[in-house]
Amino acid sequence: MNNLSLNTFPSISLLVTHYNRSKSLENLLNSFKDLNCSFGEIIVSDDGSEEKHIIKLKELSQKFTFNLVTTVKNKGLGNNINKGQDAVSKKYTLYIQEDFVPSPLFPSKLKDALSFIENDAELDIVRFYAYYAYPYLRPFNEDFSEMYIDKFASRYDKIYYYSDHPHLRRSSFFNKFGRYPEGLKGDITEYKMCISFIQNKGKGLFYNDFANLIRQENPEDEPSTMQRSNWKQNPNFVIRIMRDVYRQIKYNYDILMMKSLKS
């Protein structure tokens, strides 16, 4: 049996953003419970879900003892993360969207990540999940690599130094990088924070086995709510080349010229 004390994180707030996927949220929270994984507090930030999900959220808040932060209408990802982060009271934030499920190994790696961020005042983020490996990595230890970036980095996907995918960060994140822009599509919101992270010289670690530590689940009855423009996913070779050239130019321009998210 797992030792409960080993999986207790009193200095970490679990922040979960939610929209119309209460079954997925319940699955996530049950998974942490099954792993004997507990936090200093749990914040669930809802983005104006349908009434049936709000009713379920209120039931779940009693079962799992979390602070439910709501809004009267859908305001987008930026507002949802901002108001959730504003409700956090602990020193560190584990940010996860509701459609993820941690593996049995997750608590021990979260413990490692917490140790790293506690002992390195310059470390801003530890990432646990991605669709593919960050292009610029150097060895840190057996399980983690250090992300790095410089002005001569030629890969356009260098901007994903930051990602909205599951990560541990300091709860003072906004002080260094600014708040998430509001009123925009989710992918644009994330993009602007990616740029801000680079502009403000963020520092982060990346979990090497990123596809297996925590998995994303989107059942048919609760599909992903993130929609991206079709041309960005077009398999046509010419379209891909045009897209890559466009991204290389735009991303580098934005790193240099985009207005800072910091007020």
Question: What does each model-identified segment do?
Answer:
Residues 30-39:
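Short, acidic, metal-binding catalytic loop of nucleotide-sugar glycosyltransferases
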Residues 59-76:
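Conserved donor nucleotide-binding strand/loop of the catalytic core
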